[in-house]
């Protein structure tokens, strides 16, 4: 099992929790189920649930009807996955701004906590 960590900004915002709090019940349930799959499978989780993006950033995917949630994350030493940010996606490509935000949060996490 992998430990799932929700990234918090220095001002104590939790972007993934904010996303989860905004989701409708069915989409929330599917998103939480996908996070559970990540917890159970770690880096072995593959499409359609998880996809590598770039710079060791990965994307979790959950779909309910026409809505698709994406939660970006990275792995750290000790069987841990850090969920950085997420959004509801309407297009095929992950927005560059979301990938850049995930990279920024990853760098911030590593600066504050190292690779623990």
Where are these regions (language model features)?
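Conserved Hanks-type protein kinase catalytic core
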Residues: 74
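Compact, Lys/Arg-rich rRNA/RNP-binding cores from ribosome-related proteins
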Residues: 87
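Basic, Lys/Arg-enriched alpha-helical interface segments
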Residues: 1-68, 77-81, 90-116
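Portal/gating segments that form or line small-molecule/metal binding sites
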Residues: 71
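Conserved catalytic cores of phosphodiester-cleaving nucleases, focusing on short active-site segments
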Residues: 84
């Amino acid at each position: 099992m992998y430990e799932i960590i929700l990234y918090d900004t220095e001002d104590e915002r939790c972007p993934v929790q904010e996303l989860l709090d905004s989701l409708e019940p069915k989409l929330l349930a599917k998103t939480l189920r996908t996070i559970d799959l990540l917890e159970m499978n770690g880096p072995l989780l593959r499409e359609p649930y998880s996809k590598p993006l770039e710079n060791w950033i990965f994307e979790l995917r959950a779909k309910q009807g026409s809505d698709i949630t994406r939660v970006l994350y990275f792995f750290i030493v000790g069987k841990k996955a850090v969920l950085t940010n997420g959004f509801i996606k309407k297009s095929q490509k992950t927005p560059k701004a979301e990938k850049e935000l995930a990279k920024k949060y990853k760098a911030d996490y590593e600066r504050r906590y190292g690779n623990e």
